[in-house]
Amino acid sequence: GILRQCIHDGFGLTRFGETLSGPEYAQRFIDEAREAGIEASVDTTVIGLDRDRTVTAVSRKGLVQYQADAVILTMGCRERTRGALSIPGERPSGVFTAGVAQAYINLKNKMIGRRAVILGSGDIGMIMARRLTLEGAKVDAVFEILPYASGLPRNIQQCLKDYGIPLYLSHT
């Protein structure tokens, strides 16, 4: 999932006592699951869950059913779309969600532009401001609708202040 494209560190300090990149962090959990004998199904869509905990799914193997003692629903996450954020207009060229920008840069080695502004001061927004700067882009500013930054103080320092990227609060 999303951890593959998070090549920056900052994961795992609480759980593993060291700072890891997204792929390293994910691999730790994969290793733990394998060691515990946990079977995982990827590229699989659950299409039914009965009261008796019979799970019906579709995968490359076809239609499969599992009888479970317990079911843990892990739906994953998705970025909110431009429409969900009430950003008006059509799908303009050069406007990316942070996840899409991160995938282009970190997984596909494609730069999304030479100048950028970031809307939102969450951790991923600040990390992307730094990443774009490291890749040679000019990040003019990070804009935050709230009167305070929503990311961690360390990211304000390491991603914005250290690179001279201004943060404008109460702005959109």
Region locations from a protein language model:
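Residues forming the flavin
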Residues: 1-172
